[in-house]
């Protein structure tokens, strides 16, 4: 709810449980019991993220391509706010917009138009991670989708990097490279495996939009050296890492809000206008 936070858009909205899990781990008002109500009528963990229903969700997504365009719009908003209100000693708007996008998103016409505009405007604060697992609900994505996605985005004027999307260090390195861009939006092509670690369903269309099943889940956990019988279990050391990240984020938030207070003291008219815009 504070102005200069980074934005995150899950354009591939069908992967909503990823967002809900991270919101829970990072201390948002979303309990473990609510995660267990995933996709149930009346729950705060619906099958696609919904703005205003689940704390921490920036925008509703689901219709393919919509989230991609939402991300471009958010990046344009950051550019506008920075150009309007920033002063040399007060960079009160300099946040990033991150999005996870899918094959289905990039098939849709709206993503083509939005990507072209983002490249034209040079939205350097926009970083999209494209989950390229080469699978659709019908089978291999190549049945209907064979275009050169990296080449298309380079033609739009984007920075493009291709990585192993199952390698966390590679993802971090690519994001940092994208943050170094000052004139182009970024597309990180993450080559991944659907149902990663599943002995029988990895890289199979059967894992698209359907549960693995209890037995396959057990086998997958065993293959990944995870306690096979535990459900909704988070290792204590992992929880500590997330809690440390929350503390760091809170410190960053406090620092940036203090910057806005100092800005208001020096530029009261601009701060008043910003307040009116923020209140709608």
Where would I find each of the regions flagged by the language model?
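Thiamine diphosphate
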Residues: 1-98, 240, 244-280
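Glycine-rich ThDP/TPP pyrophosphate-binding loop and its adjacent helix/strand module
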Residues: 53, 57-244
